[in-house]
Amino acid sequence: MVQVLSVLVIPLLTLFFGYVASSSIDLSVDTSEYNRPLIHFTPEKGWMNDPNGLFYDKTAKLWHLYFQYNPNATAWGQPLYWGHATSNDLVHWDEHEIAIGPEHDNEGIFSGSIVVDHNNTSGFFNSSIDPNQRIVAIYTNNIPDLQTQDIAFSLDGGYTFTKYENNPVIDVSSNQFRDPKVFWHERFKSMDHGCSEIARVKIQIFGSANLKNWVLNSNFSSGYYGNQYGMSRLIEVPIENSDKSKWVMFLAINPGSPLGGSINQYFVGDFDGFQFVPDDSQTRFVDIGKDFYAFQTFSEVEHGVLGLAWASNWQYADQVPTNPWRSSTSLARNYTLRYVIQMLKLTANIDKSVLPDSINVVDKLKKKNVKLTNKKPIKTNFKGSTGLFDFNITFKVLNLNVSPGKTHFDILINSQELNSSVDSIKIGFDSSQSLFYIDRHIPNVEFPRKQFFTDKLAAYLEPLDYDQDLRVFSLYGIVDKNIIELYFNDGTVAMTNTFFMGEGKYPHDIQIVTDTEEPLFELESVIIRELNK
């Protein structure tokens, strides 16, 4: 007889969180705020942090997103709930009523995941429930001085949940033991589960035959420890241009990022259903921007790996100038493994499945083979502005001797003119160092001067290709009101950052400029699009 198991991955932490008293929940709110993103999910009101329980309903053809949610304030606080939203295309989201809530105001339903129990191993379902909609949530129940792993099941496809009467299903007598991720291991016909044991900085991997009774199989610990581990994820990722795959362990740290605050790291290796063994001890980051944390993947995805993250940073998330909501998610990304300089590296890209035909192209600028000089910049001349743009640029670096300090070009994201001023952020490339960078400092705007809001970040990249002896690079970017996602060299490196222009201002046009008098950069292809939801 084949033993059916669930695999659970849990990190084992030390943080103090504030308390906010309960009040009535009112989701009716004006959503016309000038800097609210259009296609990055934001709650209508209140506070959001980690995405939870991502899954795809194959029967309803619907994506489900749950998230850490405080509807009573725009800062973290208990009682904490699982908020809920759905989408049929990953960019147009409908927010629903709270999915799971705590029993008392000084408690919280902390992060977790959802598994579709097709085979009814839990015994929660009968034949009237579609196998694709047998939804079981496993989450951390945060009560005073204790964190346990509890489960709840849904009989209506994930909109409402009933808590298991014999909770908790895992209790290790710790107040820093959370963020369970459950997944079905097809090869071993098993469910696996992991959690973070924060205080001891390790990931614990459990197995179960019924989602109710769990056995500890192994521990994992590596990489940047930071102050705590959290939000661990273990998933099989395909290798590009092959029929092979490798297992990848994702885990988050906070604080402890080299950039400050929170970040996600990953490890490539093998998993036998019980233990994860990395290929090496090297630390790699999922996204090198300042605002990409608590990464989650969708379960029940038919092809490939699709995931998103919380687009903020614990260093300043509760201070950003948005109202009546705080925080957004990143866009969903497709993940693969690619050999880069003979080493497997995680790559991320947004493709047509994430930016579907339902996104309206309002206007477009398209150019080819432009030799960029200080007398020949590129500028959009779009008639209106939605604050939502994307751009795709492939360029090569010409072999010229240029003056020191004149080895770069910049992409300026400019606001509309308001009160006789224009706010800008810039992305650029320095050919002398093979370095992409972003500068999100905006003079005369208060928030970007916050102590921990690192305004300048950079990334060294090897060329994507060579044209004879000339280096070739590519950059795709998407700008959505107050967030920019950058994908360098076909997704070899991703960088996500929020930015905040002055009151009433948001992105209006894009310029590509350089200081060089002679052409150092040939822009082989430039496509800039103004988009609308």
UniProtKB/Swiss-Prot annotation:
State the superkingdom.
Eukaryota
Q: Name the Enzyme Commission number(s) assigned to this protein.
A: 3.2.1.26
Its catalytic activity? Answer: Hydrolysis of terminal non-reducing beta-D-fructofuranoside residues in beta-D-fructofuranosides
> Which residues are noted in the entry as substrate-binding?
47-50, 68, 110-111, 178-179, 314
Record-level Gene Ontology MF annotations = sucrose alpha-glucosidase activity
Keywords recorded for this protein, A-Z: Glycoprotein, Glycosidase, Hydrolase, Signal
Q: Where is the signal peptide?
A: 1-22
Q: Which residues form the active site?
A: 50
- Pfam families per record: Glyco_hydro_32C (PF08244), Glyco_hydro_32N (PF00251)
Q: In which family does this protein belong, per the annotation?
A: Belongs to the glycosyl hydrolase 32 family.
For this entry, the protein name equals Invertase
Q: Which species does the entry assign this protein to?
A: Schwanniomyces occidentalis
